[in-house]
Amino acid sequence: MKMNVESFNLDHTKVKAPYVRIADRKKGVNGDLIVKYDVRFKQPNRDHMDMPSLHSLEHLVAEIIRNHANYVVDWSPMGCQTGFYLTVLNHDNYTEILEVLEKTMQDVLKAKEVPASNEKQCGWAANHTLEGAQNLARAFLDKRAEWSEVGV
């Protein structure tokens, strides 16, 4: 039975992480286009990101990616802790998205601190690790050639 949530219709046993895939496209009544990407770091049901590393990578990418692309709406973690969703507005160039993600991950490796990792700006400020986030980014970058190979 087809479900309302796109990712619930994805056969998670047939994908091969890491990958970047278009998860959804929506056209607004005024013609705006919203594209949601599934940016998968870990193999579903086999591995996951630990929460401090995921949380820190969320902060780093959410801040840094906007230096490379003004059409980014959101970068948010998946509850299963295997990846993130990247949502963009009025932009439909998959190759450019891969390039932006690559530049962003390279910048994550150069970061000296996790942005907004304090009690004033974050709801769980004690739950961060720059080293963990950089390890995730490095592992993702190491498999750059595989990002477009989803496996489904």
Curated annotation (Swiss-Prot):
The keyword Iron applies. It catalyses: S-(5-deoxy-D-ribos-5-yl)-L-homocysteine = (S)-4,5-dihydroxypentane-2,3-dione + L-homocysteine. Fe cation binds at residues 55, 59, 122. Binds 1 Fe cation per subunit. Its cofactor is Fe cation. Transmembrane segments: none annotated. GO terms for molecular function: iron ion binding; S-ribosylhomocysteine lyase activity. GO terms for biological process: quorum sensing. Disulfide bonds: none annotated. The keyword Iron applies. Keywords: Autoinducer synthesis, Iron, Lyase, Metal-binding, Quorum sensing. Homodimer. Involved in the synthesis of autoinducer 2 (AI-2) which is secreted by bacteria and is used to communicate both the cell density and the metabolic potential of the environment. The regulation of gene expression in response to changes in cell density is called quorum sensing. Catalyzes the transformation of S-ribosylhomocysteine (RHC) to homocysteine (HC) and 4,5-dihydroxy-2,3-pentadione (DPD). Belongs to the LuxS family. This is S-ribosylhomocysteine lyase. It comes from Helicobacter pylori (strain J99 / ATCC 700824) (Campylobacter pylori J99).
